[in-house]
Each structure stands twice: as C-alpha cells, then as structure tokens.
From Swiss-Prot:
It comes from the Eukaryota. Usually encoded in the trnK tRNA gene intron. Probably assists in splicing its own and other chloroplast group II introns. One of its GO terms (cellular component) is chloroplast. The keyword Transmembrane does not apply. InterPro entries: Domain_X, Maturase_MatK, Maturase_MatK_N. GO terms for biological process: mRNA processing; RNA splicing; tRNA processing. This is Maturase K. Pfam families: Intron_maturas2, MatK_N. Keywords: Chloroplast, mRNA processing, Plastid, RNA-binding, tRNA processing. One of its GO terms (molecular function) is RNA binding. Belongs to the intron maturase 2 family. MatK subfamily. The lineage of its organism: Eukaryota, Viridiplantae, Streptophyta, Embryophyta, Tracheophyta. It is found in: Plastid, Chloroplast.
Amino acid sequence: MEEFQRYLQLDRSQQHDFLYPLIFQEYIYALAHDHGLNRSILLKNTGSDNKSSLLIVKRLIIRMYQQNHLIIPVNDSNQNQLFGRNKNLYSQMISEGFAVIVEIPFSLRLIASLAGKEIVKSHNLRSIHSIFPFFENNFSHLNYVLDMLIPHPVHLEILVQTLRYWVKDASSLHLLRFFLYEYRNWNSLITPKKPSSSFSKKNQRLFFFLYNAHVCEYESIFVFLCNQSSYLRSTSSEAFLERIYFYGKIECLVEVFAKVFPVNLWLFKDPNMHYVRYQGKSIMASKGTSLLMNKWKYYLINFWQCHFYLWSHPGRIYINQLSNHSFDFMGYFSSVRLNPSMVRSQMLENSFLIDNAIKKFDTIVPIIPLIGSLAKAKFCNVLGYPISKPVRADLSDSDIIDRFGRICRNFSHYHSGSSKKKSLYRIKYILRLSCARTLARKHKSSVRFFLKRLGSELLEEFFMAEEQVLPLTFPRVSSTFQGLYRGRVWYLDIFCINDLANHE
C-alpha cells in the first residue's frame, strides 16, 4: 500500500472517479505481480517462451491507446499476428492490473478506518486463529448455531451493480464487464479446486476481489439490520453491572408475561447473536430458541432473494444445537460439551456432594477428512495406510526428509488448538512412514532398513514440531511426546488455512 501512496498523488475524490487512466501506467503492472517497483521481469507465463517484461507492457499500453484493440473478433483474419498470438497474455495482464486499480478505494477506506480506531498493529487481526479464542469466550454460553453457505451470484451483472456503490468510474465498470463476459467462469472461481480454464488459474485475484466485494456489501447491510433488531446492544465493561441487573429484570418480565403473552416472549430475550465467516462459509450462533433460529434462517433466504437476487436453498442452512452437534469450520470440528465435576461442600459436621457441569468449547482434529486429504496428495491410501511418493532422482535424502518435516510442522502449527492430540499423532505417523517408504523406493531398499538407519533422525524431525514453535510458551517441557497432549494454543501468525486441512 506504500507504493500506492507514493505514486498515486491524487485526492480521494479523484481516485474514486478517475480510476480508468491508471490502466495505462506501467507501475500498476509491476505492483500486480508483487515485484514492488522492479521493472525488469514482471511475470513468467506457463507457456513455452512467453515472458511479460517491460517491453511487452509498453507494447500493451500502446495498443490500448488505439481504438478497438481491447475487444478482438474471433474470426478476424486481418488482425495483427503478434496481438493474436499474445491475446491471452495481454488479457491476463490487463485483468491483473485492473484488479490492483479497483482495490485502491477499498484499501484507502481500510487505512482510514484503522487510523480512526488507533489500531497500530493490525497484522494480528488478520490471523484466522484469532476466531477460535472468540469461540471459546462466547460459544460456551450459546445454544444454537446456523451453519450456512453464502450463495454466489448466478449472473455476472450483479457483481458490476454491487461494485457501482464503491467505484464511480463508468469506464472501469465497462472494462470489468468485458472481462466478466469474456471469461464466463465465475462458478469455477468460487470453488478453485475445479478450475475450468487457464485464465481462472492465473487471474483469481480479480475474481476473489469481486467475490469479497459482494460479500462485503451483503454483510454491511446484514450487520446494520442485526443492530437495528437487537434490543440489547453490546456494552463496555463500565456498564457491565447494569447489564447484569437488566438481565434480572428480563427474567422477571418473562415470569410475569409467561401466563398472558406466551407468543411474544422471544421479544424480551436477548438474542446475543454472533456472526463469523471464513471464505464462503459462515456461522451464526445465538442464545435464543430453535424458533428464533428458524426465523433467522428464512429471513436470510428472503434477504438474499429480495436484495441481491440470489437463490439459496433452505437445505444449505443447517440449525444445530451446540450441546448435541458439532460444526465443521476452518479445519476443526467444534462443539460445546458438558464437563462434569463434583464439589464437596462441608457445613459444620455435615458434608454434601454437589454435581456441577460446566460448558466447555471443544475443538478436535477431523481425522477422516484429513486422511482423505492425505490420500488425494498421495501420502496414503483411503484407509490411511502410508504409501511412497514419487520424487525426482536428484533430490537428496535430507531434502526429502526436510519436505516431509515441513509438512508435519505446518500440520502441528495449524492444529495446535486441538483438544485431543491423538489424531495429530496419527497424521504424523502417516507422514513419517510415507517419508520412509519414499526413501526406500528411491534407494530400492526395504523400509525396515531406513527406519533402523534413520529412526532417531526421523523421530526428531516429526515429533519436535511443537518444541520448535512453542519454545517460549512451554519452556520447561523437554519430552517430545508431551507436546502431543498439551492444551490448546492459538497463534496470531496464521493468515490462511492449511491446504491439506482445507477439506471442505
């Protein structure tokens, strides 16, 4: 963002209204390829000899100044051969540069909001692990959860209409329409595991930006409506006692009105609604009843249809009780379970045993989906039996061990918040034995021989994962096996979900 502020010496109104001329600036394409202001080589194409250098960027800008060169007829035999051969390359470059340009208004709003709230270190807020401490603090007091998938637009014009509220430049919107109708692969970009064309693989930044803008517009309206419908707003710690007394008044009102107005009881209850989203999946949890959650379910369906013309099937929204069901979110199976405890109370010569049950938020590693992900990556079969992976002959044994160990450390780092570490131990066992089978396949030897020769080294590589990432949190723990049974630890440096853990 510093590069934007350095080069874009325009006030905010100009940046909102005149974004299209920036498509003719060379530094935009340098920023699009994350090379800062390095003007040497911007992109290596997956083709045979195509390289997008500064010369190609200048050639592209010259052609864009000419008329009718952005839209090329398919059956035009008189078109320039060089432009026809590089049509996909030019289109890719323009779309990536355009993605950088349309992100400018959103980036400026983000900087202004962070400066207004005096948030100096905002990187910790980006960690996806910061969601789980929020779950621990709030979900143990809630009853029901809505597990839903956010629908995506079925018509590309809806994306353009949504972006009109943020980008006021008509020329930029017309260019956006050109890309959207030129490459009709929106559904494949929502699920990037099944890309339908090479363009979708290389130009996901633009389509991810459009999807995030669509979700941002939906959430801004949705949060506003939730705040308007909530009777009890979140208060600061100074008014905490007043809120406790108000809860007591609510319970008294419920007892009074229970006999006369049983239908309107839910109006006096604080719904205490919480909303969390990651990618296309969102969670809504409430302290209310199942009737209230059903009302929210059909309200969301009507909200998507009326305001955004999106059809969402009721079967895509599940209502589960937290005490009886677990929900799959960000690679964890999360639930609220009762932790029974017995307390002995003694008064004078009499003693009493009091059964007490405390709600506790529980997170476990889903072993079956993880084994399925490892099977797709060819680390094991569908039953979890480790197999060897084909590797290049020029890789050394230390490189192979380091690659397997890095994967194992990433697993341990991401799933450090699991309540039960035995599933994580099984994943490590699969990776360790798969590494041994890979080495044995390379040297055309037996697995027992390599386990006997490299047993201690493999053991240190695969079981020292927590010791390397937790040296300050648990300095007294020395045994490598004790790391498998530690408590939950959440990190603030994880910005994306593990690829093998993203089994949804």
